[in-house]
């Protein structure tokens, strides 16, 4: 058993990096092959050539007949079978150990980088904890990537070796050993009868070893099926990812989104009507349309640079609006509607209204219907028209023109306060009448 200790120590590493079925296969290999082959097979086939007897005295005939009956010893054949079947497992163990060590180095390197980034220096206690956790973590692994492919390949090679040795055993010996073997090879003079020792015991042992080989073969096939179903299940759980070039072309409709949502109990105004914005959906991988060309800078207006505040009139030319007296009929809407195309007439009316207001302010002391010369008359000395005619020209009736108090029309040198009192007395007298 000391000769098998080295192989046993190496195969123990396989047990740490295998599935459940792989561990069962290793158990069958250790107990039912190596152990039985080392303890019982040597005693059964110990006297194999010495007990092979032939009924001839011809020198060399017995050795030639034994070589024809047993080209290779059963024990040596089974040893070769164990070595060949274990070789893929040894190769897988070497790759698994290398993979685990590389993972440990990568994790330790990442931990050091994180420690340097965080600015924390790990002491000896932390390093020992990392080493202990790394040694424990070697037994925990996941069959994925290259490690999974290597594991599947080593199972396939084990299966092929098992099938090859079973077929070779059948062609060499068959599945049983007969007690009588007839030999006619040279230098035997004729057909020679040879006898095999313990044929029944050897047949039972051969059948047992073939059954163990069949169990190992079944475990290999079962493990391949288990890994295949596991891969199919994980592939079905993943979302299907299609490359960009294989996306089918579909006509996508636009999505209409209302810019203003109607509130409950309110009615939208004319300018707040719902406008639908269309956002066309584009396919992945389609060429985007080129953006609109930028407008040249010469289309923009130059801003007028203003200096101090006194120069604001140059940048902003604004005029205050002027107001004219309007009759009651026009205020109430009784006047004739203005035509749409009468824009120049409106400007002339505004100028005349301004001129009338200035004249009325100057003629406060003049009685109604009296003609007074104004500074704005022509050089030829034309007389000013009465106020009633001017008002009629502006579209106002003469009856509705405001009349002034007679006391205020006469020239009076009294101050304004006395004049206002006199006008109020006159108005009260008019009311009493």
Swiss-Prot record:
Keyword Hydrolase in annotation: no
Annotated signal peptide: none
CC terms in the record's Gene Ontology section: connexin complex; plasma membrane
Biased composition (Low complexity): 127-136, 329-339, 416-425
InterPro entries (UniProt xref): Connexin (IPR000500), Connexin50 (IPR002266), Connexin_CCC (IPR019570), Connexin_CS (IPR017990), Connexin_N (IPR013092), Connexin_N_sf (IPR038359)
Disulfide bonds: 54-194, 61-188, 65-183
Lineage of source species: Eukaryota, Metazoa, Chordata, Craniata, Vertebrata
Similarity comment text for this entry: Belongs to the connexin family. Alpha-type (group II) subfamily.
Compositional bias ranges of the Basic and acidic residues kind: 346-392
Protein name per the record: Gap junction alpha-8 protein
Intramembrane segments: 2-12
Result when mutating residue 44 to E: In CTRCT1; cataract with microcornea
Effect of residue 88 to Q: In CTRCT1; severely decreased gap junction channel activity; does not localize to the cell membrane
GO molecular function terms noted in the UniProt entry: gap junction channel activity
Topology within the bilayer: Multi-pass membrane protein
The protein's role, per its UniProt record: Structural component of eye lens gap junctions. Gap junctions are dodecameric channels that connect the cytoplasm of adjoining cells. They are formed by the docking of two hexameric hemichannels, one from each cell membrane. Small molecules and ions diffuse from one cell to a neighboring cell via the central pore.
Keyword terms: Cataract, Cell junction, Cell membrane, Disease variant, Disulfide bond, Gap junction, Membrane, Transmembrane, Transmembrane helix
Gene name of the encoded protein: GJA8
GO aspect biological process, one term: cell-cell signaling
Compartments, as annotated in UniProt: Cell membrane; Cell junction, Gap junction
């Amino acid at each position: 058993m000391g000769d098998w200790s080295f192989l046993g120590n190496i195969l123990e590493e396989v047990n740490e990096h295998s599935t459940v079925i792989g561990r069962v296969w290793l158990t069958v290999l250790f107990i039912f092959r190596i152990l039985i082959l080392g303890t019982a097979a040597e005693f059964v086939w110990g006297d194999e050539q010495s007990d092979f007897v032939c009924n001839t005295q011809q020198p060399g005939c017995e050795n030639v007949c034994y070589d024809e009956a047993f080209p290779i010893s059963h024990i040596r054949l089974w040893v070769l079978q164990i070595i060949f079947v274990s070789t893929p497992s040894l190769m897988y163990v070497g790759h698994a150990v290398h993979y685990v060590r590389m993972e440990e180095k990568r994790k330790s390197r990442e931990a050091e980088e994180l420690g340097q980034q965080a600015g924390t220096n790990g002491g000896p206690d932390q390093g020992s904890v990392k080493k202990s956790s790394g040694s424990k973590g070697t037994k925990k692994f996941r069959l994925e990537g290259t490690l999974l492919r290597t594991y599947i390949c080593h199972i396939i090679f084990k299966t092929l070796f098992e099938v090859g040795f079973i077929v070779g055993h059948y062609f060499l010996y068959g599945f049983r050993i007969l007690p009588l073997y007839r030999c006619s090879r040279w230098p035997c003079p004729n057909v020679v009868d040879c006898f095999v020792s313990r044929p029944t015991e050897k047949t039972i042992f051969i059948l047992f070893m073939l059954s163990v080989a069949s169990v190992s073969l079944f475990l290999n096939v079962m493990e391949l099926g288990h890994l295949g179903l596991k891969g199919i299940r994980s592939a079905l759980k993943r979302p299907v990812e299609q490359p960009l070039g294989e996306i089918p072309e579909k006509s996508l409709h636009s999505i209409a989104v209302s810019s203003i949502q109607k509130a409950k109990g309110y009615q939208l105004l004319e300018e707040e009507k719902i406008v639908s914005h269309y956002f066309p959906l584009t396919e992945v991988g389609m060429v985007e349309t080129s953006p609109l060309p930028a407008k040249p800078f010469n289309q923009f207006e130059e801003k007028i640079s203003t200096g101090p505040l006194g120069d604001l009139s140059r940048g902003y030319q604004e005029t205050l609006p002027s107001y004219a007296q309007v009759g009651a009929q026009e205020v109430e809407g009784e006047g004739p509607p203005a035509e749409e195309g009468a824009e120049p007439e409106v400007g002339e009316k505004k100028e005349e209204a301004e001129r009338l207001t200035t004249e009325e302010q100057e003629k406060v002391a003049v009685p109604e219907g009296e003609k007074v010369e104004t500074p704005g008359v022509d050089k030829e000395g034309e007389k000013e028209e009465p106020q009633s005619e001017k008002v009629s020209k502006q579209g106002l009736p003469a009856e509705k023109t405001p009349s002034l108090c007679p006391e205020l029309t006469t020239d009076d040198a009294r101050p304004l306060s006395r004049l206002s009192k006199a006008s109020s007395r006159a108005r009260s007298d008019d009311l009493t009448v």
